[in-house]
Amino acid sequence: MGNGTRLGRVRGLGSSHHGSHHWLQQRLTALGNVLLVTWLLVSLLRLPLDDHAAVHRWASNPTVALALILLVISVFWHFRLGLQVLIEDYVHGEAMRLLAIVALNFYAIGGAAYGIFAIVRIALVPVAGVPGGM
């Protein structure tokens, strides 16, 4: 079967087996999000939310800060995976699709970096003696 037949023209254009990896990543990040958001909600419900210093001390705990950073990474990764599928399926034109995916990657990386920076800043800046302020 040479290049002149229909089979020859489509040979090599089949599944590249990236779909199952992408699907698995999406499910694993969803599971991570469920676990981490559940932990976050339970933790926040146990805190005195009217006490800024207590919430700040809680967020300054290295274990809590690490879990919050993992939550930010997992949420933005899951967000990027889901929107990438939508862009690949519904954005027509190679240039527009490439532009949309590049913008999505910048937005996801930038949002995650900003969230991580905020968590690290909260964890490293001591609580001032003034109630409600830093």
Regions found by a protein language model. Give the residues of each.
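Membrane-embedded alpha-helical bundles that constitute the cytochrome b-like, heme-associated redox core
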Residues: 1-134
